[in-house]
């Protein structure tokens, strides 16, 4: 399993200390998924209460990237559930950060992937509208997430850098 053999994610505290330019997310997120620490290049989506583009993204090879989903902060439905967490893990995504909610928490927690979201919510999102934007900068939790930049998450928080830190 490539996810389990990947090198350990650097500590956000070390990354933040060594990189004064690092952006640090406001501490708004709950941790889900079987991995509490994850990092990788960013892929971005902006959607609202429709997870069609989220599904389309996690069906693609993740190649160790982290999918950052700006769901507008909506807590009225979940954008990621157990099925999408399984797809993301199977397709090599390192993690998912959701400015919104998730569901099927037990299923997500059973997957070898890191997930951050604002909350859990039992209602599923709309499907099929395919509305949203892919690959654009998204802004939430006091941070600008740009496609191809680098994100690191662990129990201390979420840090964003222009590129992977020197090891």
What do the predicted segments below correspond to?
Residues 144, 157-159:
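Short, charged beta-turn/beta-strand-edge "cap" motif at the junction between a beta-strand
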């Amino acid at each position: 399993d490539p996810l389990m053999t990947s090198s350990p994610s650097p500590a956000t505290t070390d990354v933040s200390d060594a990189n004064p330019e690092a952006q640090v997310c406001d501490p708004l997120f709950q941790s889900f998924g079987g991995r509490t620490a994850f990092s990788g290049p960013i892929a971005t989506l902006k959607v609202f209460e429709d997870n069609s583009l989220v599904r389309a993204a996690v069906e693609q090879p993740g190649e160790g990237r982290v999918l950052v989903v700006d769901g507008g902060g909506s807590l009225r439905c979940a954008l990621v559930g157990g099925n999408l967490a399984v797809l993301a893990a199977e397709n090599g995504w390192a993690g998912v950060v959701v400015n919104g909610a998730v569901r099927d928490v037990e299923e997500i927690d059973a997957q070898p992937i890191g997930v951050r979201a604002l909350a859990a919510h039992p209602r599923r999102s709309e499907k099929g509208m395919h509305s949203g934007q892919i690959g654009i900068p998204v802004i939430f939790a006091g941070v600008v997430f740009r496609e191809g930049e680098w994100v690191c998450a662990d129990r201390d928080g979420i840090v964003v850098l222009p590129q992977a830190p020197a090891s």
